Design a protein with these regions (language model features):
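Preference for intrinsically disordered or flexible, low-complexity segments
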Residues: 1-205
Length: 205
């Protein structure tokens, strides 16, 4: 299974209802937003369709990724998931199939002082890559997993998104000694576009 590599670039234009990494999510009006999780990215599925050679992913609509990763930005007073495989409350993936015929709004996250907390949004550029591609990606094999498959009951689950540790202009994301966060989904759930039951696991060498 090939990977879809995700390269990040400085955003030169407004990325409203476009694929973007960090920033604030653009969601349908009155969407139930998990404000206790960090927004990672939103991905327009029509931008990844040509690289999804096995037709595993949706090819229209938008995918949204949220996770309890504030701790890994160095905010050590924040909640940190303790299980090897995270509970569903700690990782959320949402799929909105129709992005053409409804009204969207940007949800801005703020702290107790009403200061915006989102990281600077970045443009996402997609390309085809080999299965073991490192960095940020979708699909393929986990780059730094040191065993053959995920443990039961997650054996055979698909890598929906791999999030790499990195130094950004305004912060550092470090998953336990420069590891990676792997967001996983059951293959049948992915086929049925059901993203309600996902998990994630941090691997670090």
């Amino acid at each position: 299974m090939d990977s879809i590599k995700i390269s990040l670039e400085k955003a030169e234009n407004d990325l409203f209802i476009q694929s973007k990494w960090w920033g604030n999510p653009d969601l349908p009006e009155k969407f139930d937003v998990p404000d206790d999780l960090t927004f990672i990215c939103q991905i327009r599925c029509d931008e990844i369709a040509e690289y999804d050679v096995e037709n595993l992913l949706p090819h229209k609509g938008m995918l949204y990724f949220f996770a309890a990763i504030d701790y890994y930005f160095g905010n050590f007073d924040s909640y940190c998931p303790s299980n090897l495989y995270w509970d569903n409350d700690d990782i959320k993936v949402f799929y909105v199939e129709d992005i053409e015929n409804q009204t969207f709004e940007q949800v801005v996250f703020v702290d107790d002082d009403c200061k915006e907390v989102a990281l600077k949004e970045m443009k996402m550029v997609f390309s085809k890559a080999d299965s073991m591609c490192d960095g940020n990606k979708m699909l393929g094999e986990p780059y730094n997993r040191e065993w053959d498959d995920w443990d039961e009951p997650y054996k055979g689950w698909v890598e929906l998104l791999q999030v790499d540790s990195d130094d950004y202009d305004d912060c550092t994301l470090n998953f336990i000694d420069w590891g990676m966060l792997h967001i996983l989904i059951n293959r049948n759930d992915l086929k049925n576009k059901d993203f309600s039951n996902v998990t994630s696991c941090i691997c670090s060498t």
